[in-house]
Amino acid sequence: MKKSLMALAVAAACPALALAEPRLVDTDRNVFISAEEDARAVLRVAAVYNDEDFRIHYEYETDTPSWYHQVWRYEDGEWVRYGSGGPGPDEHGLYEDRISMMLDDGKVEGFDRMGGWMTAHDGMRSLTSEVDADAVREHPKLGGDLGRSDVRKYLPQTRVTDDPEETSWDQVADDDALDQLQSDGVFLDLWQWRSHRSHPMGHADNNYVLHYRLSSEGTSMFTTNWDDDADQPAWMFDPEKVGAPALEWEALIAREYGQDDAYYIHEGNAVAFDPDHDWQEGDVIPQRFLQEPSGSRGAIRADGGYEDGAWRIALTRSLKAPNDHDSKTLEPGESYNVAFAVHSAAGARWHLVSLPMTLGLEDGEADIVARRVDGDLDEADLEWTEVEVFYPGQITYQFLHSDNHPGRELVREGERGVRDQHDLDTLPDFIVDMEQQLLHDAD
């Protein structure tokens, strides 16, 4: 009954984002396994470059695009936040779509074999094994230095352990060791295109993965629209530019605000929040305030949008890393290890992922070949590659090295990867079976 109620709730609250009935829902344990037809898709990828820049193109078909994100809604005299990253899709469709790429130049041992699963670990947020927030806050590095209350992606190389199965979120290497890894290039470059938090400003979000999922150097393209001291939003829409100080809740959840409308708030359409305005029930102000980024954080430019039933996005960055400590330089003739992910109106681990692949700049042996262009990248002919993406389950680095994984010895030997042992006809079902078995064993 719980499973059916969740599916009906999503459909009733936001018909445009209605999904088929999920296979399993247990929100108390961070579980949402969507229907089989919603757990697999295809991301089309093409890449080109010239003497200065590299560009990657994405096409992702969807009938339910989301360029909305979290909002403040006025209720009974208070501003209440709406929009959740999971479990599963947000019931009101108030979470952005996202397309991500992790990229490595061969310096992160194991990424070519395990892909994104090498960054997924027991205790991470949104897993059934999620660590208690207070424990993270009390950790000297994650809570003290980073100010975090959850565990996110990290490289096992940043933890101190002799046994990979025993790798733990709290065994973080000391600062000198982390600095050395970063100087040696032992980190993953992470390009995150965000339909709400970055795209309206003409950018993708430049991040990297080391001992945590970290932001690249510079100013972010989004911040939180909230004044802690006044306990109210910091900004509202400028009525002279937008026509009203807020959006309307009913219009928002009916998906009436298009890509060319003021569905996001930013430096060019905002004024300081006026608490004395005659606010009405259901007035809505975006929870994220957008701004022009700087430094390496803003190094990836984004173009395109949703058109003819698909996201059609182009991301462009200089071949040279904007900052060698958080980004990878791309060299003509070289090949790189990559892994992709797609979020559809959901956050955290509720996404679809690819197997590890290779991206080559004129390397014909790579899975995805970036073609060289003399001159303007806008004039390039594109060579598309279809990348299958699917639900990644609760497979973690620790699980892959444990007795629960039938391929444990092959993983530990380090000579064969997921693509050597699995095919996409059977792997997605195996992953779901493993998640259900782990949940059963924990009962």
Mark where each language-model region is.
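Beta-strand elements of well-folded, non-transmembrane domains
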Residues: 49-51, 60-64, 319-321, 342-346
